[in-house]
Regions:
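Short beta-to-alpha loop/turn elements within the nucleotide-binding domains of ABC transporters
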Residues: 147, 158-159, 165, 174
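Extended beta-solenoid/beta-helix repeat architectures
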Residues: 49, 69-71, 148-150, 165
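Terminal amphipathic alpha-helical/low-complexity segments used for targeting or macromolecular assembly
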Residues: 1-41, 47-48, 88, 101-107, ...
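Flexible, glycine/small-residue-enriched loop-and-beta-strand segment within the central core
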Residues: 53-64, 70-145, 174-175, 181-183
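A generic "structured core" feature
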Residues: 154-156
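General secondary-structure propensity
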Residues: 141, 159-160
Length: 205
């Protein structure tokens, strides 16, 4: 009853002040799931999105996160070259999403690395990352620059995603490879009363 009342209050116009209070508490008492996220890139408040107080979102003005998302503890989102996360995405703990890498440039420039402007560094890898609606990213997965992951996917725990992943794929391993389909995984559940009508992609079923 108490939890239900708190939920109703949060979903009222008081949602933003409650979010700000939770965010403050989360910085003092970590880890803590903070309800609500202000999407700077879209200038919209995502009331149903929940992000851990220990998650690090760098350059978050270049990070777009849809509503109903979940980002768990100690995950890192490098927004320097843009991240777009669709609605309903869940991201496990210790996940890394990277949009740049200096793994080539540091050798090419040697001791001059810091003296060279980032935009002028040879071998400096950049690429935005996109994650489609209702995709699940397992704990410890790493997503590298330039990758596009489709909708309705499952990225297994510990996977290293180096290339694009099509819609409804299950990907695992390092480097990650497609090992199955979430359509096949979900098919048995679609016979449960009311589930087929709620399925996120009606065209797929």
């Amino acid at each position: 009853m108490k939890a239900s009342l708190l939920k109703k209050i949060y979903l009222s116009p008081l949602g933003m002040p409650i979010h700000l209070i939770q965010a403050f508490i989360g910085r003092v008492f970590r880890p803590f799931m903070v309800y609500g996220y202000y999407d700077k890139s879209q200038k919209r408040f995502r009331k149903y999105t929940r992000i851990s107080s220990t998650a690090l979102l760098s350059d978050n003005e270049h990070i777009s996160i849809g509503d109903n998302c979940w980002i768990w503890h100690h995950s890192i989102l490098d927004g320097s070259n843009g991240i777009r996360i669709g609605k309903g995405v869940q991201i496990g703990a210790w996940v890394g999403i990277f949009t740049h890498s200096s793994h080539i440039a540091i050798r090419l420039h040697g001791d001059n690395y810091l003296q060279v402007d980032r935009d002028d560094r040879v071998g400096y890898v950049r690429g935005s990352v996109t994650i489609g609606d209702y995709t699940f990213i397992g704990a410890g997965a790493k997503i590298l620059p330039g990758v596009e992951i489709g909708s309705g996917c499952v990225i297994s725990a510990g996977a290293m995603v180096t290339r694009d992943v099509p819609d409804h794929s299950i990907a695992a391993g390092s480097p990650a490879k497609v090992i199955g389909s979430t359509i096949d995984l979900d098919r048995g559940y679609l016979e449960i009363d009311g589930i087929r009508e709620q399925y996120f992609n009606q065209d797929a079923v």
